[in-house]
UniProtKB/Swiss-Prot annotation:
Domain of life: Eukaryota
Protein name, UniProt field: Putative F-box protein At3g17270
InterPro entries hit by this protein: F-box-like_dom_sf (IPR036047), F-box_dom (IPR001810), SCF_F-box_component (IPR050796)
SMART domains: FBOX (SM00256)
All copies of domain F-box, residue ranges: 2-48
Pfam families named among the record's database cross-references: F-box-like
Length: 135
């Protein structure tokens, strides 16, 4: 005899899933159509980004470093920004960073979205835009 769990209300399911790390959510998007749609909803992405721990890519002395930052409970009224100058000569390999054909540093799932070509950092609640849609 198989025991089934009754369906959770959508709000509760969304709240629980918003606390799951984005790497796991990316793997789960094919579980069901409802979750796939939820993970693509910009409100859910923003909620997940606001609740997740932060990782930041820092360019220092021609090296790229990954720094984890837990901002839970910190006032988010300001958006910190960084400006990089100079040329990137090498990239330290990281399983969380994908480098596209256009030589852009792109989308570490719980980090930021940065285009080295233009030296701009796009932020959504201190995290990444296109959080779950890796190109």
């Amino acid at each position: 005899m198989m025991t089934t769990i009754p369906n959770l209300p959508d709000e509760l399911e969304s709240e629980i899933l918003s606390r799951v790390p984005a790497k796991s959510l990316a793997k789960w998007k094919t579980i069901c159509k409802r979750w796939y749609a939820l993970f693509r909803d910009p409100r859910f992405v923003k909620k997940n980004l606001c609740k997740s721990a932060r990782e930041v890519m820092l360019l220092m002395n021609d090296r790229v470093h990954s720094i984890s930052v837990n901002r839970h409970g910190i006032d988010d009224r300001f958006e910190p920004s960084m400006e990089f100058s100079g040329k990137l000569r090498s990239l330290i390999d990281s399983k969380d960073v994908k480098v596209s054909k256009e030589a852009n540093l792109a989308r570490s799932l719980n980090t930021m979205y940065a285009k080295l070509k233009s030296n701009r950092i796009s932020k959504l609640c201190g995290g990444v835009m296109n959080h779950f849609n890796i190109r």
